[in-house]
Swiss-Prot record:
Bias (Basic and acidic residues): 73-85, 102-119
A Gene Ontology cellular-component term: phagocytic vesicle
Location of the region described as Disordered in the Swiss-Prot/TrEMBL record: 1-160
Pfam families: HABP4_PAI-RBP1
Disulfide bonds: none
PANTHER family, per database record: AT19571P-RELATED, HYALURONIC ACID-BINDING PROTEIN 4
GO BP annotation list: regulation of translation
Protein function: Ribosome-binding protein that acts as a regulator of mRNA translation by promoting ribosome inactivation.
Organism: Dictyostelium discoideum (Social amoeba)
Assigned protein family: Belongs to the SERBP1-HABP4 family.
GO terms, molecular function: RNA binding
Biased composition (Low complexity): 28-42
Protein name (record): Uncharacterized protein DDB_G0288133
Alphabetical UniProt keywords: Translation regulation
Length: 265
């Protein structure tokens, strides 16, 4: 075995494709290519979003999820202010797919959707149950047989009596009626000596007098024990503070011996 042989050549299963060498002569012999025409620049139809009330100032375009909304000719006629079309508002839903903040709204208790036909049933505003109208029409369209035609004869209605009264007749009729008071049953009426209760004897019970507790309480309230106590203050043993000199009595001004000029001459 030759050691110089490359072992990785065994991994190449695909057949090798021989590359054809390209020469400059073949490239020159090729047909000339037509000259390219200049491409005109694309002009975008830009819709200017200018408001006539604000002096024609440019504003950013309204974009909904990266898509520009362009108004059609029909939408321009229906709009009042400008030619912009606005997407319809879709309410937000929760994880279950229901509209949010609607769990406390009023709902139909019947479980029927609003689009369901409600003509079945009775009551004011309904048209009866299914099949009732057809049954009435079938009865009306039934044709009687020959035997039934002979038996069905026109029935003459009996004349209705006129029971109306005038005022004078009504007063006479009321005057002839006498009103009697119902008889009242007298006590002991219909009772006999041999009644069902004659065999029994009346029960006699002694009346027990109970002591009145109120009088006892009133007696206790009237008799009260009164104790006379004489309160006296104890004599004071304290001496007066300060100067202990005797106070000299004043002179009698009306004394004639002391003031002789006051005597009568």
């Amino acid at each position: 075995m030759d050691k110089s042989k490359n072992l990785f050549d065994l991994l190449q299963d695909d057949e090798e494709v021989e590359k054809k060498p390209t020469t400059k002569s073949t490239q020159a012999a090729a047909a000339p290519v037509a000259a390219k025409k200049p491409v005109a620049p694309k002009t975008e139809n830009k819709v200017e979003n200018r408001s006539p009330k604000l002096g024609g100032q440019s504003k950013p375009k309204r974009v909904n999820n990266g898509e520009q909304q362009v108004a059609t000719s029909e939408e321009r006629q229906n709009t009042k202010r400008d030619s912009k079309s606005y997407p319809k508002h879709q309410p937000r839903t929760d994880a279950t797919g229901n509209i949010r903040n609607r769990q406390f709204d009023r709902k139909s208790g019947t479980g029927r959707p609003h689009n369901e036909n409600k003509k079945g049933g009775a009551g004011q505003g309904n048209w009866g149950k299914e099949g009732s109208v057809d049954a009435e029409t079938n009865v009306a369209t039934v044709t009687p047989t020959e035997g039934e035609k002979e038996s069905t004869e026109p029935v003459v209605a009996a004349p209705v009596e006129d029971k109306t009264l005038t005022l004078g007749e009504y007063l006479k009729q009321q005057g002839s009626v006498t009103l009697e008071a119902p008889k009242l049953r007298v006590a002991g009426e219909g009772e006999t000596k041999n009644a069902q209760w004659d065999e029994f004897e009346p029960i006699q019970r002694e009346v027990v007098k109970q002591r009145d507790t109120k009088s006892v309480k009133e007696e206790k309230k009237t008799k009260k024990n009164v104790i006379q106590v004489e309160l006296k203050s104890a004599p004071s043993t304290q001496r007066p503070k300060g100067n202990t000199k005797k106070v000299v009595k004043g002179v009698d001004v009306t004394d004639v011996n002391i003031f002789p000029s006051l005597s009568k001459a």
